[in-house]
């Protein structure tokens, strides 16, 4: 009986740690996919000199991700990237992590990349930002 009690106490201490690590891993996976998509669109930008032209070539540059490129497109998971090429020089991207956090980035050819995080999102409202975000990193 004492052994069962000790195991229960150890599980009670380990479970919150495990759940926190799982959430962090889900966030990092989504962020990594978003960075890969950014690298892909920058590669396309070098060829087309336009984010609008580059967004159409994303799936051939980085085929492991799925891209939603219409203006109202929303990410529905960590491997689906919502892309909004605002104009030739600016692009917004977003991805929904499994824990409901929408990770965003906005890249401007003139001023660089900014990042954002929005909690409590769903598959219908994790959309790419149309303007620069507030943070310079996650």
Spell out what each predicted region is.
Residues 3, 18-19, 54-59:
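Generic detector of short, locally flexible boundary/turn motifs and exposed helical patches
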Residues 1-18:
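N-terminal single-pass transmembrane signal-anchor helix
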Residues 17-35, 49:
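Aliphatic-rich helix starts adjacent to a transmembrane/signal segment
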Residues 39-138:
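Periplasmic/extracellular, small/polar-rich flexible segments of pilin-like filament-forming proteins
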Residues 4-5, 30, 92:
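Intrinsically disordered, low-complexity segments enriched in polar/charged residues with Gly/Pro
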Residues 14, 21, 41:
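Conserved alpha-helical elements of the SDR catalytic core
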Residues 7-9, 35, 128:
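Alpha-helical interaction segments
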């Amino acid at each position: 009986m004492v052994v069962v009690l000790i195991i229960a106490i150890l599980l009670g201490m380990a479970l919150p740690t495990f759940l926190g690590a799982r959430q962090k891993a889900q966030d990092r996976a989504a962020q990594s996919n978003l960075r890969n998509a950014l690298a892909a669109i920058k590669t396309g930008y070098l060829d087309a000199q336009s984010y609008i032209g580059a967004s159409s070539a994303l799936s051939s540059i980085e085929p492991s991700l799925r891209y939603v490129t219409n203006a109202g497109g929303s990410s529905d998971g960590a491997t689906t990237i919502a892309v909004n090429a605002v104009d030739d020089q600016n692009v917004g991207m977003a991805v929904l992590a499994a824990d409901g956090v929408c990770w965003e980035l906005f890249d401007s050819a003139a001023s660089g990349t900014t990042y954002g995080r929005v909690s409590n999102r769903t598959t219908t409202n994790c959309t790419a930002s149309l303007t620069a975000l507030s943070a310079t990193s996650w």
